[in-house]
From Swiss-Prot:
Catalyzes the interconversion of L-alanine and D-alanine. May also act on other amino acids. It is an enzyme of class 5 (isomerase). The modification N6-(pyridoxal phosphate)lysine is found at K34. CDD domains: PLPDE_III_AR. This is Alanine racemase. GO terms for cellular component: cytosol. It holds the Pfam family Ala_racemase_N. The gene is alr. Belongs to the alanine racemase family. Pathway: Amino-acid biosynthesis; D-alanine biosynthesis; D-alanine from L-alanine: step 1/1. The active site is at K34, Y249. Its cofactor is pyridoxal 5'-phosphate. It comes from Rickettsia canadensis (strain McKiel). The keyword Isomerase applies. One of its GO terms (biological process) is D-alanine biosynthetic process.
Length: 355
C-alpha cells in the first residue's frame, strides 16, 4: 500500500453543490462524475450528492454509467455524454442509462434498439453551438426541424449544448453560443434544455435553463469553491549533501551550498508530472519547499535546508496538494489545468474519504 494519503472531503464537495444550488435557484443542479469523478471517486461522490437530492449524474461512457448505476440504484438519471454505439446499446437499456445523442447515426441506433425491445427509449440531444467536438451539426439540426419523424419512437427529455470558453466571462463567444442555442430551442418549445457547465453557471441566469451540469466547480476548480482534496506524503529519507552535489537522474540539479535533502515516495507513476522537476513546490507546516532534481517514477527530492530542524524528520507529512497548493495553483506551474492534475492522480494512493 502507498505511503501517501489522498484525502477527499465529501462535505466540501457537498458545500460546493449547495453554493451552486443557491446560484441556480430556478434550475436543477446535476453533477458531472466522468473520469471517476475527476479522479476523486465517482461512486463515493455520487453517493454523497444523492443524499442532497442530486438526481442527474453525467458520465462519459456506458462503462462509467454502469459503475455508478450499480452503486446508486434506480432512482437517479445517469446520462452518457458520448452517446450510444451499436456495441453498448443493450447495456444502456439494461442499466437504464440515458444516452446523449450526438449525431443522426446515434439517433438511428437508439431508435432501432427501441423498436427491437418495443420500448420508448429516453434520450437527450446534443446540439453543437460552437465547441465543435460532439453534437449534432447545424445541417443535422435543420433535418430534425424539418422532419420530426427522425425522432419518432424516442422519449426526448432534454436538448443540451456545451460552452467552449465559459471561464472567460467577457468573451463574446459565450453570448454567440447562447443565442444560437436559443434559436434552435424555439423549434422544440416543449423540451427542457441544459447549457451551463461549471463556468456557464457563473455567466448568469440566462445560461441556466432547466438543468446545469457542474463538474470542475464541485471539485474546487474555481476560485469561489472549496478545495476538497489533500494529498500528503511522508519524508522517507534524509541526507546531508555538500556543495556541488548532484541530485537525481541526469544530474539536472546541483547544490549551491551544503544542503539537507528529503525524499518523498511519489512520482510520475502516481500522476505527479515529470514537468514538476526542478520547479514544483510542496509545503511543510505552511512553508514552501522546492522540488530539486528530476521527478522519477516513484520518488521526488525536496530541499528542506531552510526549514527549522524541528520540522525535518523521517515521517514528517508533506503537503503535495491542499489549501496551500490547490490543483489549480500547482497546475499553473507547469502550464496545465487543475482538471489534468486531478484526473492524473491514479490508483496507487491510500484514499481516505471524510465528511
Amino acid at each position: 500500500m502507498s505511503l501517501c494519503t489522498l484525502a477527499i472531503n465529501l462535505s466540501a464537495i457537498k458545500n460546493n453543490y449547495f453554493l451552486l444550488q443557491d446560484i441556480c435557484k430556478t434550475s436543477l443542479v446535476g453533477a458531472v462524475v466522468k473520469a471517476d469523478g475527476y479522479g476523486l471517486g465517482a461512486v463515493q461522490i455520487s453517493k454523497a450528492l444523492i443524499e442532497e437530492n442530486c438526481r442527474h449524474f453525467f458520465v462519459a461512457s456506458s462503462e462509467e454509467g454502469v459503475n455508478v448505476r450499480k452503486a446508486l440504484g434506480i432512482d437517479v438519471n445517469i446520462l452518457v455524454l458520448n452517446g450510444v454505439f451499436e456495441h453498448d446499446a443493450l447495456e444502456l437499456i439494461e442499466y437504464n442509462l440515458i444516452p446523449i445523442l450526438n449525431n443522426l447515426k446515434q439517433i438511428e441506433i437508439w431508435q432501432q434498439f427501441g423498436n427491437l425491445k418495443n420500448l420508448l427509449l429516453p434520450c437527450y440531444l446534443h446540439f453543437n453551438t460552437g465547441i465543435n467536438r460532439l453534437g449534432l451539426s447545424s445541417n443535422e439540426i435543420e433535418q430534425l426541424i424539418n422532419n420530426r419523424d427522425l425522432l419518432k419512437g424516442l422519449n426526448l427529455q432534454y436538448i443540451i449544448s456545451h460552452l467552449a470558453i465559459s471561464e472567460e466571462i467577457d468573451n463574446p463567444y459565450n453570448l454567440e453560443q447562447l443565442n444560437k442555442f436559443k434559436a434552435y430551442l424555439r423549434y422544440f418549445p416543449s423540451i427542457k434544455a441544459s447549457l451551463a457547465n461549471s463556468g456557464g453557471i457563473f455567466l448568469g441566469q440566462d445560461y441556466h435553463f432547466d438543468l446545469v451540469r457542474p463538474g470542475a466547480a464541485l471539485y474546487g476548480l474555481n476560485p469561489l469553491m472549496q478545495n476538497p482534496v489533500t494529498l500528503k506524503a511522508p519524508i522517507i529519507h534524509l541526507q546531508n549533501l555538500t556543495l556541488d552535489s548532484h541530485i537525481g537522474y541526469n544530474m539536472t540539479f546541483t547544490t549551491k551550498r551544503d544542503s539537507v535533502i528529503a525524499t518523498l515516495p511519489l512520482g510520475y507513476a502516481d500522476g505527479y508530472s515529470r514537468n514538476f522537476s526542478n520547479q514544483g513546490k510542496v509545503f511543510i507546516n505552511g512553508r514552501s519547499v522546492p522540488i530539486v532534481g528530476r521527478v522519477s517514477m516513484d520518488l521526488i527530492n525536496i530541499d528542506v535546508t531552510d526549514l527549522p530542524p524541528s520540522d525535518i524528520f523521517l515521517g514528517q507529512e508533506v503537503e503535495i496538494i491542499g489549501n496551500h497548493c490547490t490543483p489549480d495553483k500547482i497546475a499553473s506551474i507547469i502550464g496545465t489545468i487543475g482538471y489534468e492534475v486531478l484526473t492524473s492522480l491514479g490508483n496507487r494512493y491510500r484514499r481516505k474519504y471524510t465528511r
